[in-house]
Amino acid sequence: MSKMPAKKKSCFQITSVTTAQVATSITEDTESLDDPDESRTEDVSSEIFDVSRATDYGPEEVCERSSSEETLNNVGDAETPGTVSPNLLLDGQLAAAAAAPANGGGVVSARSVSGALASTLAAAATSAPAPGAPGGPQLAGSSAGPVTAAPSQPPTTCSSRFRVIKLDHGSGEPYRRGRWTCMEYYERDSDSSVLTRSGDCIRHSSTFDQTAERDSGLGATGGSVVVVVASMQGAHGPESGTDSSLTAVSQLPPSEKMSQPTPAQPQSFSVGQPQPPPPPVGGAVAQSSAPLPPFPGAATGPQPMMAAAQPSQPQGAGPGGQTLPPTNVTLAQPAMSLPPQPGPAVGAPAAQQPQQFAYPQPQIPPGHLLPVQPSGQSEYLQQHVAGLQPPSPAQPSSTGAAASPATAATLPVGTGQNASSVGAQLMGASSQPSEAMAPRTGPAQGGQVAPCQPTGVPPATVGGVVQPCLGPAGAGQPQSVPPPQMGGSGPLSAVPGGPHAVVPGVPNVPAAVPAPSVPSVSTTSVTMPNVPAPLAQSQQLSSHTPVSRSSSIIQHVGLPLAPGTHSAPTSLPQSDLSQFQTQTQPLVGQVDDTRRKSEPLPQPPLSLIAENKPVVKPPVADSLANPLQLTPMNSLATSVFSIAIPVDGDEDRNPSTAFYQAFHLNTLKESKSLWDSASGGGVVAIDNKIEQAMDLVKSHLMYAVREEVEVLKEQIKELVERNSLLERENALLKSLSSNDQLSQLPTQQANPGSTSQQQAVIAQPPQPTQPPQQPNVSSA
């Protein structure tokens, strides 16, 4: 089915080639290349596949991307993680997967794509809810918002991305039936636009993380992360939401680029965050706000919302001014996503991170600013913040709005140093965007961090991630904790894990601010944490484990997404792999539903699997498992995984499965380094596919040429015969004609029509002339 193009750079990617027969083509591309019949089966199957896919994905089909593939290829590149067809995720399946609990919406493809992201974010947000049960439910509504975010997604514009060309050749050529999808492969820069494949979407929730992961591996994704969030805010302000998502998207890219690797992760959690929003109520709000931070953009747009919601969660307010009421809450969530970004920030990304945020920030300004996290961003934030800050005011109190936002930021901060800066930034941003760090402190102060810490355990794990979860519990305590966090935070930020911790903090942040909110916050934190955790994880593999833990917590939270994320982190080392894994996992969940989609999904898994195959399974099981616990994912994952990998029979029908298998096999065989296998296997598969495609083209051309030649030969034959006939007639006429007539010919030609006879004669002469021409033709 779809192979992941191993090479990002190649312009030509075969998104999906399905073989009805088996995955043979997939497993052994070479074979299929050689064997036309196979191709044919493939074609048929692909058609079916496509169709189903289309149905599944609906429009997304187009986008369907190969995000996973991309991811694979991206490895370094993180080309396009972004995918997301938010809609897809909508499937719900995803959502479920993501946060099943959460709310299906979560599904949203958080995909890495920022655009998608946005939507996903939303979705994620949706899913996040799980974490805050309260939030969760709300989440659902939230998700709707998120969906809205999708619009931002447009950036992704999957549709434009692919063109499906159906070759129907009259001849019975085996290849004839194939359905080819040409996807323009955008380079990473297009990241945001990266096509997202529904599959991605599917994955996205989990993908989210994985994306993040993947991204982190790739780095690209980072940005995506948050976007969604904003969207999720949708409710709050759809606009804001939307904007945020957009922002997120846009911002995404930069971060992606920069921190690429991490970024993605952030994304993931972002997703998780979102759900919290629902809680806006206060607690919920907090949550959301927590998330918000991450999502600066979201926050921003939503921010207002956030503010509204936040009020309940002052902290939320912090970020955006969450003060606003709960409405903002939702927003807050968005903020959540931000954190993810921070993740990316984690690395150097910080700078870039800012970018990511930057976009959103604007929206965010208020609280989200914090998200801006990156210093650059932070400055940006600063500005925003300034703007925001005003709103922040409420926050100020909290920690200074800035602080509070910062807190949110913290989340991001947690993400990585970048994140931390982000967080700080956020915090700072609001407060002192310029100084991400300082903000960080703020965040610490936000206590968000503390929350994470509260988790205490988690902190260890993720530093904050888990904490976050705990955070909620200890929302209040978080506050106390924060200092540590703070202290740690700074360091944390330096350390990926730390950042993560921070991230968790983020959620806390809100908590801190709204101390009262705290509880909510805690929830938020929980969610956030997840996210962060994953982030952290991704950043630091080591955290990874914690992440897992975190994940579970998160899971509870509904971080499902996060789980995925954390999963990614887990992989982190494998980073991509794990991401894939994560994706896979989630995907898996989705897989069922999206088996077709899965196809794409599978890809990531494939790579995942490839390197991680074993790992994947276990890891997936493990890390994902927790997260997966979300039932949907879990079971799906299990089924998918097992199916995917093991399942053969399915292959036919489910390319994805086949793909998994094939890829899996290849990967296993190759199973060099994660990436090696991923890229290696992917490359091989892609090369094979390309070869196959070239052969196909060659054969088509050959047929066409032969047909043309035959036609031309026949025509020449006819012309020659006609020419000879005319010559004979001409000779006959000449012999019969009198000299007078012949002498008149020239004149007649000059003045034809003088006599019918002459005309006849004249007519004849031209014929003679013609013959020569004809001969020429024939000779030609």
UniProtKB/Swiss-Prot annotation:
Residues 20-86, 126-158, 235-499, 587-607, 736-780 are annotated as: Disordered. One of its GO terms (biological process) is response to osmotic stress. It comes from the Eukaryota. Residues 28-37 have a biased composition (Acidic residues). PROSITE patterns: TSC22. Residues 126-146, 297-316, 344-361, 395-412, 453-468 have a biased composition (Low complexity). Belongs to the TSC-22/Dip/Bun family. May be involved in the loss of cell cycle regulation in colorectal tumors, expression is shown to be decreased in the majority of tumors. This is TSC22 domain family protein 2. It comes from Homo sapiens (Human). The gene is TSC22D2.
